[in-house]
Each structure stands twice: as C-alpha cells, then as structure tokens.
Amino acid sequence: QAESGLTHQDQKRKKNELRRMERREEELLLAIEETEGEEARLREELAKPENYTNHGKAQELSESLDHLHRRHRSLMGEWEELVQHRERLQGELAGA
C-alpha cells in the first residue's frame, strides 16, 4: 500500500478513470466548439433580411438557436463538472 493510502489497484483504477475523463473532456470540447459554430451560423441566417422578414423562417431559426443555446449550456455544465472531478483525481494521484 502506498503512503497516501491508495493501493496499487486503487492507483491503477484512478489512472484508468482519469484517462476516460480526459477522452470525455476532448469529446465535450469538440461538441462545444461545434455548437458555438452552429449558433454563429444560425445568427447569421437570422440576420439576413429574407429570413427575419419571413415570420415562419425567423421562428424556425429562433427555435433552433434556443435549442442550441440550451445544448451549449448543458455541455458547458458537464465540462465544468468533469474538469473539477479530473483535478481532484489528479490531486489524489499526485499525493500517491
């Protein structure tokens, strides 16, 4: 058993968990980037005169933008939680 109280098995399990978290973080950052790009594209579409003067099209674009905004917030929340958990785990391993 290590001085920190973590057994070799615990350290191995935590390192595996850390790798999974790092992969998930990469996935989240990519999804966040894609969502931000799509939000920007929809804002540009909504700003076009032919779209904002067409109530149906403007409504559709606004709803899509709302959906993307909610998704972005959700992804950011998950990412922030993941980063905090990852940092705690790294601290535990550093003390091992």
Task: Indicate where each model-derived feature is located.
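Charged, heptad-repeat coiled-coil alpha-helices that serve as long linker/dimerization "arms"
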Residues: 1-96
